[in-house]
C-alpha cells in the first residue's frame, strides 16, 4: 500500500512481505502484529512457522536505527474479533519502523489489548 511504502521511504508498487499475527499470553489474545517487511534486505526467505518475525529479524537482519510511536486507538471490528474485546475498545498501539543503514527493514503496528502497560528505564 502507498502509505506503507511512504513510511519505508520506498516507491509505490515495490513488493513487500506482509504478515499479520495474533500473539497470545496465557492462552488469551494479547496483541495483533501487523508487519511489513522489505524483502530486498532479507538474507534468506524467513520461516515464521518456527520463530516470530521479531526473533527472526533480530537473528538475521541487524538494524542500525528506528523510530517508535505510541498511541491509543479504538479497536476496529476485526481487531475486536481477534482480541476478543468490544468494538471501539481502547487499544495501546506501538508503531515502529527500523532501518539497516539507509535501507528500510520493517514497519510494524502492534495493537495491544485494553489494560496493557509498557514500562521502560531511562
Regions inferred by a protein language model and the residue ranges of each:
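C-terminal all-alpha effector/ligand-binding and dimerization domain
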Residues: 1-122
Amino acid at each position: 500500500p502507498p502509505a506503507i511504502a511512504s513510511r519505508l521511504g520506498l516507491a509505490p508498487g515495490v513488493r513487500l512481505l506482509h504478515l499479520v499475527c495474533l500473539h497470545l499470553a496465557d492462552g488469551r489474545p494479547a496483541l495483533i502484529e501487523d508487519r511489513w517487511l522489505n524483502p530486498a534486505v532479507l538474507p534468506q526467505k524467513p520461516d515464521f512457522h518456527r520463530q516470530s518475525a521479531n526473533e527472526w529479524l533480530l537473528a538475521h537482519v541487524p538494524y542500525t536505527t528506528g523510530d517508535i510511536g505510541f498511541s491509543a486507538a479504538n479497536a476496529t471490528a476485526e481487531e475486536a474479533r481477534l482480541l476478543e474485546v468490544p468494538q471501539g475498545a481502547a487499544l495501546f498501539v506501538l508503531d515502529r519502523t527500523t532501518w539497516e543503514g539507509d535501507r528500510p527493514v520493517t514497519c510494524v503496528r502492534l495493537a495491544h489489548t485494553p489494560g496493557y502497560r509498557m514500562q521502560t528505564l531511562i
